[in-house]
Structure formats: C-alpha cells, structure tokens
Amino acid sequence: MRALLLNSSPHGEASHGYRLAKEMVGTLDMQVVERDLVADPLPPISKSYATAVTSGNHHGGVFDWSERVIREVEDTDLLIIATPMHNFTVPAALKLWIDHVLRINRTFESTSTGKVGLMRDRPTFVLVGSGGFHSGERARQPDFLTPYLRYALESIGIQSISFILMQGLVGGDASVSEALSGARSALSRHVPFNRVAPVTA
C-alpha cells in the first residue's frame, strides 16, 4: 500500500496542513511518497506541450513531467493534498500540478456529455488551511477552492474526496489549536485513519 502526499504550501514542512497530514499518514502501515510542489516546482506548461495536446503529436519527451506526476497518482492507494487557500482558490503551485495531471486521452476523455475520468478512484483527502473563514457561521469570504478542486479530481475519475478545513489560522495559538484539533478529529472518522488509535498530541 502506498500513499502520495502533496504539499503546496509556501511554508513547506512548517505548514500546519502538511504537519497534520504527515502525522496522520504516519499512523498507517503504508509507504509514503511526498512531493513538495513549492520547493520542487513543476515546469510551466509550454507552447510545445500545448501544441502536442491539440495536435496529437507526442514525440520529443514533451509529456515527461506530466507522465511522472500522473504515474505518481496511479501508483498510490491514498492521495493526500495539503494546501492553503490563496485568494479564494488553489495556490499557483497546485494549479500547475492539476494542469500536468489533467490531460485529454490520458487521464480523461471528452464525450458528448462531458469529461469522463480514466483513472482509478482512490480515497483522497484535501487538507485546506486558511487564515480566515470561508465555511460555517463565521465565513466572510467565498470558497472557490473546494468546488474547483473537486470537479478537477472527479473529471479524471477520483470520486472519493474529503475536504478537511483548518480555518482561522492567523487568529493566534488558541485558534490554531482549535483548527488542528477539529481537522484531526474529522480525519480520524474516515477510512483508513479510523482504523488506528487517534493521535491527541
């Protein structure tokens, strides 16, 4: 069994979402593959890539990076994405990963009724950190991240998606502790994390 942990926070290993994801996945009997999308950024989508997608000419290694990150997903049984919310949606580093993974006739096909995913479904957890509130009674801003990322993942065949929110992270130590405790509790109610003793530290 293998898990893929993606970190798209500019705070790297100091990110609250990454640290919680690392903590929780550490309770599982799984090999963990990590990709830091900020510290080790993917190359931008180039003209040659765009031309190859539209023309069907796939020669010259133009899809090498795309294939690499797609296979990382294909080879895993559990996907965890630790991401901040930047300006109401996904950060640029995660958007670039999405652009490499969503590729017509490779991870999805286009039909008369819309995109059909070509990848196997797997449990996917998205840990979303935000300084403010975008869900619940204290929400003061819209959330475009959740519907966008859900639609993007569903379009390639990943349907089993859980969003774990960590809100109010700029509100001081008490607010951070409350957010992490709630996120940890939410994760522990889901398979495979509910099969191990909950971490309370």
Residue ranges: model-predicted function:
Residues 10-11, 131-132, 168:
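Short, glycine/serine-rich, charged loops/turns that create anion-binding
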Residues 76-77, 122, 158:
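Short, well-ordered alpha-helix to beta-strand connector turns
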Residues 136-201:
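Glycine-rich phosphate/pyrophosphate-binding loop and the adjoining helix
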Residues 104-109, 158-160:
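Short, structured loop/turn "capping" segments at alpha-beta junctions
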Residues 82, 127-129, 165:
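Short beta-strand segments
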Residues 110-155:
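Short, glycine-/small-residue-rich phosphate/pyrophosphate-handling segment
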Residues 1-106, 185-201:
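N-terminal beta1-alpha1-beta2 submodule of the flavodoxin-like/Rossmannoid cofactor-binding fold
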